[in-house]
Regions:
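Glycine-rich adenosine-cofactor-binding loop
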Residues: 46, 54, 73-94
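Rossmann-like adenosine-cofactor binding region
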Residues: 7, 107-199
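Oxidoreductase and adenylate-handling cofactor-binding alpha/beta cores
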Residues: 54-68, 95-96, 205, 225-233
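NAD(P)-binding Rossmann-fold cofactor-contacting core
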Residues: 95-112
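Rossmann-like dinucleotide-binding domain for NAD(H)/NADP(H)
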Residues: 157, 163-312
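Active-site regions of enzymes building and remodeling cell-envelope glycoconjugates
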Residues: 15-19, 39-41, 111-119, 202-210
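Phosphate/diphosphate ligand-binding glycine-rich loop within oxidoreductases
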Residues: 1-68
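A short helix->loop->beta-strand "cap" motif at the edges of active sites that frequently abuts
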Residues: 15-18, 38-41, 98, 156-158, ...
Length: 312
C-alpha cells in the first residue's frame, strides 16, 4: 500500500483484514492503535530506502559546498533523527571528515555522549537535516518539531534539509524564516499540505523535489522483499523472493569527495521539473523514473565501499 492510503477505522471497520503491509519506512498513514485493538498485524520496511534518502541529502550537500561561504569540513551538520537514514548519513559524512551532531532523544538515554539536543543543533550547526518519523503523541512528538520558536532561536543561519514527513517542519514558519533571513535557505522533498503545496513555498526553496527522495530501484526491491517475506511468514505461505536482474559490473566511482557521490543523482533536474509544474506534484511522484542509489555502485574509497556494500 502507498503512504497516500489512510488505513484507519473508516477504511477498516467491518472488514476481514488481518494483515497490513506497507513497503515504506514510515507508518504514520496507518492507525496503529486501531489495528492493535482489532488484532491486525502491521508490517513496514524500515531502512529499505535509506540509501536513496542519503543520496538525496548528499546531492544537496554538494550544492551547498559549491555556493556557501564555508567548506563542509568546517561546520557541523546537525542530523535530527538517527534511525535507519540518519545514522547511515552520519557515518558517511564522518568518512569525509565532516563534523556531525546527532540528535535523537530515544537513543540518547543509552548513549548520552553520542547525542546532543535540538537546542544545541540550532545554536551551532550551519546545516540541519531532518530524518524523524511523524508522531503526534508519546514522549517526544515530532509534529512541528521545527516551529516558530525553533527558527527564532537559530544562531548560525543554517540551511534546512527536509525529506522525512510533512508536518515535522512547520512549512509556514520555514518560509518566514527564509524571508527574514533567519536561515540561509531550505531544501524540501515533503510538504505539510501535500499534494497541495503553496507556490511561494516551492519558489523560495533552493531545491524542491516531489516526495521522491527515497525512490530508488534498490530501495523498491528491498521493500518488496521485506513485505513478501512478512506476508509469507504471517500466512504460512512459501513465496518466491522478488528478483532484480543486476548488471554484472556495478559502476565504479572514485568516491573521494561529496561531489563524486553527487554525480549519481541529478537533483537539480528533479527540482526544475517540479518548480515548473508545482500543481503536478502528485503526478510527478507517481510517474517518477526510479533511480539507482549508492548500492548500485562500487567506490574506490574503501571505507565508503564497506559502509554501503556491507549494508546490501
Amino acid at each position: 500500500m502507498r503512504t497516500r492510503t489512510q488505513c484507519n477505522a473508516a477504511l477498516l471497520e467491518g472488514s476481514t483484514v488481518r494483515f497490513i503491509g506497507t513497503a515504506t519506512i514510515g507508518t504514520d498513514h496507518i492507525d496503529s492503535t486501531y489495528c492493535a485493538e482489532h488484532g491486525i498485524t502491521v508490517v513496514n520496511a524500515p531502512g529499505c530506502n535509506a540509501w536513496a534518502v542519503v543520496q538525496w541529502v548528499v546531492s544537496i550537500l554538494a550544492q551547498i559546498n559549491q555556493h556557501a561561504s564555508f567548506a563542509l569540513t568546517e561546520r557541523p551538520v546537525g542530523i535530527v533523527g538517527c534511525g535507519a537514514i540518519g545514522e547511515r548519513l552520519a557515518r558517511l559524512l564522518e568518512i569525509f571528515h565532516i563534523p556531525v551532531f546527532r540528535c535523537d532523544p530515544f537513543l540518547e538515554t543509552a548513549s548520552p555522549f553520542r547525542y546532543t539536543s535540538l537546542e544545541r543543533i540550532g545554536r551551532e550547526c550551519s546545516i540541519i537535516t531532518v530524518h524523524t518519523p511523524l508522531t503526534h503523541d508519546g514522549a517526544h512528538p515530532t509534529y512541528h518539531l521545527l516551529d516558530a520558536a525553533f527558527f527564532h532561536s537559530l544562531k548560525q543561519k543554517p540551511y534546512i534539509l527536509h525529506a522525512a514527513r510533512g508536518g515535522i517542519v512547520d512549512d509556514y514558519e520555514l518560509y518566514e524564516a527564509a524571508q527574514y533571513r533567519r536561515i540561509a535557505g531550505y531544501y524540501l522533498d515533503v510538504y505539510e499540505d501535500e499534494p497541495d503545496v503553496a507556490p511561494a513555498l516551492l519558489e523560495a526553496a533552493k531545491l524542491a523535489t516531489p516526495h521522491i527522495a527515497g525512490y530508488s530501484i534498490e530501495g523498491k526491491l528491498a521493500a518488496s522483499r521485506a513485505i513478501v517475506k512478512a506476508v509469507g511468514e504471517f500466512f504460512g505461505w512459501q513465496i518466491a523472493e522478488p528478483q532484480l536482474e543486476e548488471k554484472e559490473d556495478k559502476t565504479f566511482i572514485v568516491g573521494h569527495s561529496i561531489g563524486d557521490l553527487a554525480r549519481t543523482y541529478d537533483i537539480v533536474h528533479d527540482s526544475r521539473t517540479l518548480k515548473s509544474a508545482p500543481q503536478q506534484l502528485e503526478q510527478l511522484r507517481i510517474q517518477y523514473a526510479f533511480r539507482h542509489d549508492f548500492r548500485n555502485y562500487h567506490f574506490g574509497n574503501q571505507a565508503l565501499e564497506r559502509l554501503v556494500q556491507d549494508d546490501c
